[in-house]
């Protein structure tokens, strides 16, 4: 079982598209769950998630609330609620590819000693990439990173974005 943990705070604009992208995954819905941690949302995030759950009864979605504000508290709540052997954090403003869950499952099956994994992070701009954006500022401001398709250790001295 794989658990996708999504921690959210007032992201009604983004949470629906994210959940829709997860619903399009080619991984069996019986083999993953979504734990969505509401970190005191005051917008319509909950309503959007409830509508998604109604529209997709085949997807195991757990909506929980964490009243202690902050990403660390929300992630810890997600871990407590998770039933999966593999935990994948997904940012609440992200979109995932249709093979996203399967690729993680295949990676952990092929590399059982792996303790953490990640993949490319590509920014999605609402219009177009600003002309002033350079590779340096892109990595700094958007968490963009791509170390290629080869399995390897994360570079020492670098930190995952997000």
Regions found by a protein language model. Name each.
Residues 11-25:
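Short, well-formed alpha-helical segments that are part of the catalytic scaffolds
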Residues 99-133:
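Conserved donor NDP-sugar-binding/catalytic core segment of glycosyltransferases
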Residues 137-161:
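Short, flexible, basic/aromatic active-site loop/helix in glycosyltransferases
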Residues 31-40, 62-66:
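Short beta-strand/loop segment that forms part of the nucleotide-sugar
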Residues 1-3, 33:
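Cell-envelope/extracellular polymer assembly enzymes that use nucleotide-activated donors
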Residues 66-82:
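Glycine-rich, basic loop-to-helix element that forms the pyrophosphate-binding segment
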Residues 21, 29, 38-47, 94:
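A conserved acidic beta->alpha catalytic loop
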Residues 87:
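Short aromatic/hydrophobic "clamp" motif used to bind/position activated sugar donors
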């Amino acid at each position: 079982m794989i658990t996708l943990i999504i921690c959210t705070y007032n992201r009604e604009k983004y949470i629906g598209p994210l959940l829709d992208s997860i619903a399009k995954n080619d991984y069996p819905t019986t083999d993953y769950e979504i734990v969505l941690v509401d970190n005191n949302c005051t917008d319509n995030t909950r309503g959007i998630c409830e509508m998604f759950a109604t529209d997709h009864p085949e997807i195991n979605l757990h909506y929980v609330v964490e009243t202690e504000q902050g990403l660390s508290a929300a992630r810890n709540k997600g871990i407590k609620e998770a039933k999966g052997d593999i935990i994948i954090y997904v940012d609440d403003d992200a979109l995932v590819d249709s093979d996203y869950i399967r690729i993680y499952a295949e990676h952990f099956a092929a590399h059982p000693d792996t303790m953490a994994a990640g993949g490319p992070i590509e920014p999605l701009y609402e219009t177009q990439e600003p002309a002033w954006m350079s590779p340096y500022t892109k990595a700094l401001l958007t968490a963009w990173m791509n170390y290629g398709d080869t399995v390897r250790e994360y570079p020492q001295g670098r930190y995952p974005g997000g």
